[in-house]
Curated annotation (Swiss-Prot):
The protein's name in its UniProt record: Vascular endothelial growth factor receptor 3
Extracellular side: 20-788
In-chain residues carrying the UniProt-annotated modification Phosphotyrosine: Y1075, Y1080, Y1239, Y1240, Y1274, Y1342, Y1346
Species classification: Eukaryota, Metazoa, Chordata, Craniata, Vertebrata
InterPro entries: Ig-like_dom (IPR007110), Ig-like_dom_sf (IPR036179), Ig-like_fold (IPR013783), Ig_I-set (IPR013098), Ig_sub (IPR003599), Ig_sub2 (IPR003598), Kinase-like_dom_sf (IPR011009), Prot_kinase_dom (IPR000719)
Assembly, per entry: Interacts with VEGFC and VEGFD. Monomer in the absence of bound VEGFC or VEGFD. Homodimer in the presence of bound VEGFC or VEGFD.
Disulphide linkage map: C51-C120, C167-C215, C261-C319, C453-C548, C474-C500, C592-C666, C712-C761
The keyword Transit peptide is annotated on this UniProt entry: no
GO-annotated cellular components: cytoplasm; nucleus; plasma membrane; receptor complex
Domain notes per entry: The first and second Ig-like C2-type (immunoglobulin-like) domains are sufficient for VEGFC binding. The fourth and fifth Ig-like C2-type (immunoglobulin-like) domains are sufficient for homodimerization. The fifth and seventh Ig-like C2-type (immunoglobulin-like) domains are required for autophosphorylation and further activation.
Post-translational modification: Autophosphorylated on tyrosine residues upon ligand binding. Autophosphorylation occurs in trans, i.e. one subunit of the dimeric receptor phosphorylates tyrosine residues on the other subunit.
EC number(s) from the headed UniProt entry: 2.7.10.1
Amino acid sequence: MKRVCTLPLWLWLGIVSEADLVSSYSMTPPTLSITEEEHIINAKDTLTITCRGQHPLEWSWPGARWTPVEGRRRWNSQPQQRPVGAGNPEEDCEGTGTKPYCKVLVLTESQANDTGYYHCYYKYIDAKIEGTTAVSAYIFVRDFEQPFINKPETLLISKKENTWVPCLVSIPDLNVTLISQNSLIHPDRKTIFWDNKKGMQVPTQLIRDSLFVQCETVIDNKVFKSNFFIIHIAGIELYDIQLYPKKAMELLVGEKLVLNCTVWAEFNSGVRFQWTYPGKQMQRAVIESERRSLQTHTELSSILTLHNVSQQDLGRYTCTATNGAQMLEESTDVIVHEKPFINVEWRKGPVIEATAGDEAVKLPVKVVAYPQPDFQWYKAGKLIPKQSQSSMQIKDVAEHHAGTYTLVLRNRLVGLEKRISLQLIVNVPPRIHEKETSSPSIYSRRSPQALTCTVYGIPAPEVIQWQWRPWMPCRMFSRRSLNSRHRAARRHQRDRMPECKDWKDVSRQDAVNPIESIDTWVEFVEGRNKTVSKLAIQEANVSAMYKCIASNKVGRDERLIYFYVTTIPDGFEIESQPSEEPIEGQDLQLSCNADNYTYENLQWYRLNLSKLHDEEGNPLVLDCKNVHHYATKMQGELRFQPDSNDATLLLTIPNISLGEEGDYVCEVQNRKTREKHCHKKYISVQALEIPRLKQNLTDIWVNVSDSIEMRCKVDGNHVPDISWYKDEKLVEEVSGIDLADFNQRLSIQRVREEDAGLYLCSVCNAKGCVNSSASVSVEGSDDKTNVEIVILIGTGVIAVFFWILLIIIFCNIKRPAHADIKTGYLSIIMDPGEVPLEEQCAYLPYDSSKWEFPRDRLRLGKVLGHGAFGKVVEASAFGINKSNSCETVAAKMLKEGATASEQKALMSELKILIHIGNHLNVVNLLGACTKPNGPLMVIVEFCKYGNLSNYLRTKREGFSPYREKSPRLRIQVQSIVEAVRADRRSRSGTSDSAIFNRFLMHKSQTVQPIQEVDDLWQSPLTMEDLICYSFQVARGMEFLASRKCIHRDLAARNILLSENNVVKICDFGLARDIYKDPDYVRKGSARLPLKWMAPESIFDKVYTTQSDVWSFGVLLWEIFSLGASPYPGVQINEEFCQRFKDGTRMRAPEYTTAEIYRIMLSCWHGDPKERPTFSDLVEILGNLLQENVQQEGKDYIPLNDSHSSEDDGFSQVPSSAQQNSDEEDFDMRIRCHSLAARYYNCVSFPGCLTGGNQIRCSSRIKTFEEFPMTHTMYKAHPDNQTDSGMVLASEEFERIENRHRKEGGFSSKGPNRTAELSAEQSDLRGRCRPSYGSQVGGQTFYNSEYGELSEHSEDRSCTPPAEGASPPALHASFFSEQY
C-alpha cells in the first residue's frame, strides 16, 4: 500500500483527523500561569510556569520533542534529555476542582539557548493539538551578549520560491540583516520578511548562488553575527517508493524476515526513512540504509531484517520516506504460521455450468496454504498438462470438456496433500441434425409421409414443437440481428434465412394435411442419446411449410421444411408409352414430366453414338451441362396441368423403326439454383417377327356339363392379334365362353352338344399369320344336364336356408372384434379350411411410414442364395436404423417375371413378419420396399457367419469339449439366464417387443460377449457354445410359439449365426397355406424333410408346436454331432417308417452328454402331449447352461467313452445343483448312477425319475444302430434321391401311407410299444411338472382326411410343404441358401 503527498498536506490531514478524534472526548485544554503568547525574561533568571488540566500533564521545551508547524504544534513521541540545567525541571503541584492535575516547570539559570516554545499537554493522549489537548507559550531569554542562538547547520535550498533562513534570536526587537556571499539583504516587508520566532524569509534566487549566509545585528554599536548557514541545493521530489516483497509476506515461526524499502528521488535528494511495525517497541528489527547516486536520480533504500520471527511479529509493516517537502509511504502485511498447512475449498460450489461455444470458463478454487504447494489438475484420472495454478481456465468451451476435474495440492517436503473435485457441466444448445443433410422438398401427392427431427442438446429438450403455415413466400432477414448466443448455436446456418409469420401449432383437428401421429422418443445414435420427433402425415394433399422447434435452457434451434406436394415422384421423371421396348412399327410417346414449381426449360435430346467418344476412341464423360455437344435436340410439345402445377414435354415418335433405338435425354433447369438436371431413358426397339406358337392345339373329348380349356400360347414379348374360330365362325365372348390372357386362352364352362366342332386359333401381325386347330368331341346327352340343374337349384335353396339360419345364430353369439383378430396369427385361430391364409393376411396392416425404406438408400451387392421364385442379395442400407450409418442387410426379392400371386405371397409374408415382431433369436425384419416403380423387397438382418450346420462342420477339428471357466463367462451366462427368467415372469404384463428391447439393452450394457466378433472363426468351439446355441434356439421357438407361429422346417440349415455367438431362426413358414395351394399337394418328385418331421406330421399331416418340438430334438442331435446328417447310414424306406412308428430312435451323437440326450428323447416322445413345451426347454437348457459353466475342470463326458467300472455313471451333475425347485419349476438335474456310461442304449425314455431312496430307470430305447435295417431297394426317379437321404420317393411313400390307412392311423399306443411306454415311465419334468398336453390345446392343424373337419378330395394326399414345390411365398431354403 503506497501513499504519496506533500509534507504540509500530510500534516494538515493529520491535524484534522486528530482534531476530529479529540473532539469526541469533550475535554478542555490545559491552562498556563502565563497568559501572554510571548514572555521575556533575562538570562540567569528563573522561569516558573504552572500548567493545570483535567488529565495527567507533561512539559516540552526547546530541544525536547516538539516541531513547529505553521503556528500549530506537534511533538515527537520520544522525549529527549532536558538541554539546559540539571535535574528534572518538572514538578507536580496541587490541582483544583475542575482541573485536578497540575505540573509546574521551574527553569533556573536560564540561558539564551532556552529561548523557544514551551508546551504543556496531556500525557496519555496521543493527539497533541494546540488549544485542545495542549497549550504553549514562547519564552525569550534575553541575553545581550548572545543575541543569536543557532548552531552551525546546513541550509537546504530547493526549488521553492522562498527560503527561510532560521536566524533565531533571544531578544525580540532586534534589527537583523542577512549577509550573503555577494550582498547585504535587508527586510523590506515586500519580498523579504523578518520573524523573531522563525528567522528571515528571502527569495531563493537571492541566495541560491552563495556558498553560505549569515545573520547580523548591532547592539550598542557592537556587531553580532550568527553562525554560518552552508547553502546546499537539494532536490525535493520523490519519484516512487517500493516495498519488497510486494505481496504479503508469509513465514513460519523461526524463519527470517527481510523487507526492502526503496525510494527513487530527485538527484542529490535527502530522504529520512521511518519504519512502523508490531515489534518496534522492543526494537527487534535491524535497519540498514543504502544510497546509490545515479546519473538521473538517487536510489535510497532502507532494509529491515528480523531474525527468528514469532507470532508476535505478524501484522502491518509500514515504511515512510520524507524529505521535508514530500512524503511517501508503502505497507505490507506479514503473516506468521506456526506450522505448514493446506486449506482448499470451492469458491462457487462443486458444480460449474458452462455453455458450449463460450470463450472461456474458469474452475475457481480458494487455496490457503503455506508453503506454496504444487498444483496438479486431473480429469478422469489423467493429468492435465500446463495447468499449475489453483484455478484452471478452459478456453473455447466444448462438450468434451464436461466431466469431473480434481485439483491435487502437494507439499512434498512436509508430506501434506489435499484434493478437491469439481463437476463441469457443459450445456449444449439444441441442434437439429437433419439440417446438415439435404432433405427432399418434393413429396408425392396422396402418399403417407413422415417428417423427422433428430435433436441433440444438453440438457435434452423435453418437447419438440411442430408448427405449420400455408405455402407462401417469406421475407429474408440477416443473421446479424441475432444475439451472440443464437449466433453460436446456429453457426451452420446461412447468413440469410427466411423469417415466416402466421405459424400454427400442428394438431389433428387443425391441419392442412391429415395428421396420423406425433411421436417423440429418445434414441441412442452414434454414441449419444438423441431426441427424435416424428410427424406422421396420413396423406400429402396440399403444399405447406412445416417447422420443428427444439429448445433448452441455453439455446433454441428450428428446422424449416418446405413440404411441396406434387404428382411427380421426386419432381422429375420420364415415362414411355406403350413401353420402353416398343415393337417395330408402333407409335412411341415419351413424356418428360417435371414439377413446374421446381424446374423449367424442359428439352428433349437424343444421344449421338458417334459423338460419345473422343478422337482417340475413349468414352466421354457425360455431363448434363454439356449434353448439347454430343446429342441432337428434338422438338416436343409442352403442356401444363393447372390442377397439379406440372409441366410435360411430349416427344412423339410415330411408326418407330429399328434405327431409332437409343438413349433419349430430357434436360430441365432448377428455378432456384439454375443448375441443370438430366434423365436418360434407353429405348430398345424390338424387331417385328412372324408370330410363333409354343405348342399346337390337340383334339379333346369331353363329357356334357364338363369344362374345357384350350390355350394358344404365343412365343415372344409382344402378343399379336389372336382370334378363335369354330367351324370357320368367329368365337366371341359370351356367357359360358371366356377369352383371357389376350385371347390366348379359351374356356368353355358346362359343355353342351352344340359346342362340338373344329376350333381354330389364328395369330396375326404385320409380318403374317400362323394357325392351329383341334377337334372337340362331346359325349353324353343334355337330358342329364337338366337333371343336374334341378339338383343344383334344390341344393342352392337348401344352402340359402341354412346360411340364413347360421347368420341368425352368429348374430346372437359374441364375435371377436377386428382388433382381436390382429393379435394372433389368424391361420392358427381360425380353421384354414374356412378362412384361407390370403384372406387372413388382408386383415394384417402395413404401416409404410414405419417400415418403408427408400430404394435409393439401398445398395445391392452379391447374391447370397437362390430360391424357386426369388433370391436373397447382400445389401448396404444407409440410415435404416434412424442414423446416418451404413449397415449390412439381406434383401429378399422375387426374380424377374414374377406373377401377381407370387408378389402377393411375398407381401403376405412381410405383413406377418411385422405382426410377429422382433426377437433376438429370430431373423428380424428391418424394412421393406413396396412402392411402385421398383422391385418388391423385404429387408431383414444379415448374419455374416452363415447357417449353423455348415459352421459346425467347419469347427469339428477345433472342437474343445471344455475350457477354463472364467468369472466373466459365469457372470455372463448367469445374466443371460436371469434376464430370460425375468422376462418370462413378467410376460403377462410386458409385450414381447419390450422384452426383446430390454434384453438387448441388458446384453449390451452388462454382459460382455462370450467371443468377440473378430475371434469367432479363430476361437475353438466348446461345450458351452453348443448348449448356448440350443438355449437360444429354444428361446426363439418359444417366442414364435407365443405368436401362434409354427415353423414346420426347424433344422440346423435354417439357423443362422450372427455376431457375438447369437443364433437366429429363419424360414419359419409364415405365408404358406398348405391347405389351399395346390402346389403343396404331394406330386411325383416332391421333397419332404422326413428326417426332421414328427410322426404325426408324416402320417397324419398334423403340424403343431409339439411337432416343432420333435424337430428341435433332431436339431439338438445335429448340434451335438457338429453338423452331421440325422439317421447316419440309415436308408429312408418303408422299413424305416415302420420302425420309426414302433419307437426306434437315433443313438446319442458323438459329442453329447447324458442330460442333452435325455432332452432329445423327451422331444421324440411318440405322444405329442407328452413332449416338453419350448418354455420347458428354455428353463431346462438355462439351468444346464449355468451348471456347465459353474463346474470346475472337465464337464464334458461323452456317452461313447468306456469306463473301467460299471458304477461310473454318466450324469455328472454337481451337488450344488440339488436345490429347492420352488422358483425353478422345471429342474433337469437328475442322476442315473445305476447306468454305466458306455451303455448308451439303456438311457431311460423319456427320462429318469427319482423316487424314494432309489433311482428307477425304465426300459431301453431301441436305436437304428442296434438293430440294423434290411436294405430294400425301390425303383424311383433319379431326382428323388439326395446325398443326405432326406427325401422319400413318392411311390414308396404312397405304399406306406396306404398301409397306414389300413392300420387306422398313427397312434402312440401301437402293439410294439407297450414295453417302451409303460405307466412307470416319466419325462424330463419329474413329479413337479404339469402335463405337457396342457400346452398344446388349440394349436393343432387337422387335415381334411383324418381331422375333425372334412374336405372332399379324390387325391386324398395333402402333404406338408416340400422343398421342390411352388408355394405362394418363397421357399424354405430362401433364407438358408444365402449362407
